[in-house]
Regions:
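Cross-family detector of peptidyl-prolyl cis-trans isomerase
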Residues: 2-319
């Protein structure tokens, strides 16, 4: 189905969902050496020699952070620059430092070499990973990204904030909903809340209800927002999507153009505070529109109910 993450502003990161090999060791025997200068949170200056890359994974922690260590099932917010090293030439493929300094969420399975490089690293670290084809996209490469099966990838990653796979809102409980709106009941720690639909008709307009009030900063349009969520259909109460079920927080830029999320999210989450749990009751016009979603069994007339936990909101490169 068309998930909340309908658009990836960073297609190469979206393409790194390959089987991971795990581990946190590094191998510095790859030659010739890549050098990096610059400070954490700023665009790195990367020097790649005009020679062929080595055949082994090379990992170097350029800046040692003192935050939470990245666990295998965690997601994290970070900035990155990716270079393509092809033969004796190289070029920049993507950089969040070059696109307004907006960090992105690393979630799900990473390229094997990138996973090896990052697992166990502490937040606040800058990590260099020189990834040979066998620990990157393999012999098939990625034609859409312009990566051949013989190309080496050079990543420089600034690790900002760690999010556990079962992270939830941390604020003060203020409501369970109800009074004509769905009732929301918290589940076991780290699991999605349950949503019970009322018997009446849904509201005609977008409706928000704060269930847990966080004390963090307010979400502003243009922020990178990290959330957990569960979505259900008002008509029958069926759940059609849940980040908790995947144990994978979701990150997006709110108010982006083109939109990365449905309209009801862009409008309903701005102004809400980090640490909050918010219920969004979203009419069709602010959701999937008249076409709905066949795969998710959402009709064009369906009102959707989301319970969203706001884990973080970030406006710049260093969070």
């Amino acid at each position: 189905m068309r998930r909340i993450a309908v658009i990836s502003a960073l297609p190469l990161l979206a393409a790194v969902a390959l089987a991971g090999c795990g581990g946190s060791s590094s191998n510095s025997s790859a030659a010739p050496a890549v050098t990096v200068s610059g400070t954490f949170g700023k665009a790195p200056a990367v020097n790649i020699p005009a020679e062929k890359a080595g055949s082994k994974l090379a990992v170097e922690t350029l800046v040692h952070g003192n935050g939470q260590a990245l666990g295998r099932s965690d997601a994290f917010l970070g900035n990155y620059a990716i270079y393509l090293w092809s033969g004796t030439s190289h070029k920049l493929l993507q950089s969040t430092f070059k696109t307004g300094g907006k960090p992105t969420l690393f979630a799900g399975t990473l390229l094997p070499g990138l996973e090896t490089a990052l697992i166990g690293q502490k937040m606040g670290s800058r990590v260099l990973a020189v990834i040979p084809p066998k620990e990157g996209f393999g012999t098939s490469g990625d034609a859409q990204a312009g990566i051949k099966g013989t190309d080496t990838l050079v990543f420089v990653v600034d690790m900002i904030k760690d999010f556990a796979g079962n992270a939830s809102a941390t604020g003060q409980h203020v409501s369970n909903g109800g009074s004509g709106l769905p009732t929301v009941t918290a589940g076991a720690a780290g699991t999605a809340p349950a949503i019970k639909m009322p018997s009446g008709k849904p509201p005609a307009n977008l409706t928000t209800k704060v269930l847990i009030k966080g004390t963090g900063p307010a979400v502003a349009s243009g922020d990178t927002v990290v959330v957990q969520y569960v979505g259900a259909i008002w008509r029958n109460g069926s759940v059609f999507d849940s980040s908790w079920k995947r144990s994978q927080p979701f990150g997006f830029t709110i108010g982006a153009s083109p939109s990365q999320v449905i309209k009801g999210w862009d409008q309903g989450l701005v102004g809400q505070t980090v640490g909050s749990r918010v219920m969004l009751v979203i009419p069709p016009a602010d959701g999937y529109g008249k076409t709905g979603s066949t795969q998710a069994h959402i009709k064009g007339t369906d009102t959707l109910v989301f319970v969203v936990d706001i884990l973080g909101a970030y406006s710049g490169t260093n969070g």
